[in-house]
Amino acid sequence: MHLTPREREKLLIVTAADLARRRQARGLKLNYPEAVAIITYEIIEGARDGRSVAELMSYGTTILQREQVMAGVAEMIPEVQVEATFPDGTKLVTVHHPIR
């Protein structure tokens, strides 16, 4: 299978988000990379589903709550920026304070 660097990056995000969701399902609190992976994955998939940048910026703040992450993780993530592919091209989605 031949993948471009961008496709490999997306595959890595999907794998990391899947692992994070499994740990979350076991009742574990998420660490920094796990939280970022889940938020990033949800934004990428939302763009693929045809949601707008504005919708995803708002949705990005509802994906995870403070209770779901380890102490201090929410403060470590002041924003998440995701370059996502929309039906009309690639756009940058910035989610400010994604974990509330």
Curated annotation (Swiss-Prot):
GO terms for molecular function: nickel cation binding; urease activity. Keywords: Cytoplasm, Hydrolase. GO terms for cellular component: cytoplasm. The keyword Cytoplasm applies. InterPro entries: Urease_gamma, Urease_gamma/gamma-beta_su, Urease_gamma_sf, Urease_subunit. Its main location: cytoplasm. Heterotrimer of UreA (gamma), UreB (beta) and UreC (alpha) subunits. Three heterotrimers associate to form the active enzyme. NCBIfam families: PRK13241.1, urease_gam. This is Urease subunit gamma. It comes from Opitutus terrae (strain DSM 11246 / JCM 15787 / PB90-1). The lineage of its organism: Bacteria, Pseudomonadati, Verrucomicrobiota, Opitutia, Opitutales. The gene is ureA.
